[in-house]
Swiss-Prot record:
Keywords: Cytoplasm, DNA-binding, Transcription, Transcription regulation. It comes from Bartonella tribocorum (strain CIP 105476 / IBS 506). The keyword Transcription regulation applies. NCBIfam families: PRK00110.1, PRK12378.1, YebC/PmpR family DNA-binding transcriptional regulator. Belongs to the TACO1 family. Pfam families: TACO1_YebC_N, Transcrip_reg. This is Probable transcriptional regulatory protein BT_2363. InterPro entries: Integrase-like_N, TACO1_YebC-like_2nd/3rd_dom, TACO1_YebC_N, Transcrip_reg_TACO1-like, Transcrip_reg_TACO1-like_dom3, YebC-like. GO terms for molecular function: DNA binding. It is found in: Cytoplasm. GO terms for cellular component: cytosol.
């Protein structure tokens, strides 16, 4: 089984749910503020902000929190955040991409480098692993959103490129530049999604054993706990048997 969303599910089951929720809301709020500051404070006039708000709603972020994050962008004391991407190799040669929004590049780079080094991996240069990934849009709906055929029909009409329906939900992907329009059309047909975001999808996978899987999990967990880190993507491929053991 590929990707690291399965690992994220494990982390959420093992971690304190309130702490996880608070961390997610904090990262969503930062993205909303940055999006609002870079463009218009009206989601209808700002595609990036519209996407950020859609994703926040999909994560059940309270309306007051969303509005407060937007208003913060117009304040005089708002931090200036830089968008930074880090790339490197983790345990077992797993390629890792880290996206961050930071007001202190030196601090974030130091923390990310330390996480890679502690795991036995190494932080590389920009472009060192991203060639093994494609930048795409991903929209996730819960299973109860509809049957696989119904979701497929809606996705095709919306201009999506692929749909994977599983027990955990429906995963719809589209071109990176189309995610705003596709997600908006899908919402009119299926309601609000569980998740809407642009992701790095691995095109080359690195098979790993249980020992390496545990090390990769620790690396991803450490990175995602950093307040500056918004997203982490990895190209590991782990068996269902190992995944089941890790989820115990």
């Amino acid at each position: 089984m590929a990707g690291h969303s399965q690992f994220k599910n494990i982390m959420h089951r093992k971690g304190r749910q309130d702490a996880v929720r608070s961390k997610i809301f904090s990262k969503l709020a930062r993205e909303i503020t940055v999006a609002a500051k870079q463009g218009a404070p009206d989601p209808a006039m700002n595609p990036r902000l519209r996407l950020a708000v859609q994703n926040a709603k999909a994560q059940s972020m309270p309306k007051d929190n969303i509005e407060r994050a937007i208003k913060k962008a117009s304040g005089t004391d708002v931090e200036n955040y830089d968008e930074v991407r880090y790339e490197g190799y983790g345990p077992g040669g797993v390629a890792v991409i880290v996206e961050a929004l930071t007001d202190n590049r030196n601090r974030t780079a130091s923390n990310v480098r330390a996480a890679f080094t502690k795991s036995g991996g190494a932080l590389g240069e920009t472009g060192s692993v991203s060639f093994m990934f494609n930048r795409i849009g991903e929209i996730i709906y819960k299973p109860e959103a509809g049957t696989a055929d119904h979701i497929m029909d809606a996705a095709i009409e919306a201009g999506a490129e692929d749909v994977q329906s599983e027990e955990s939900g429906h995963h719809i992907t589209c071109a990176f530049e189309d995610i705003g329009e596709v997600s908006k059309t899908l919402e009119s047909k299926l309601g609000e999604a569980e998740s809407i975001k642009t992701i790095w999808k691995a095109t080359t996978l690195a098979p790993i054993d249980e020992e390496k899987a545990l090390s990769v999990l620790r690396l991803i967990s450490t990175l995602e706990e950093d307040d500056d880190v918004q997203n982490v993507y990895a190209n590991f491929d782990v068996s269902d048997e190992i995944l089941a053991k890790l989820s115990v």
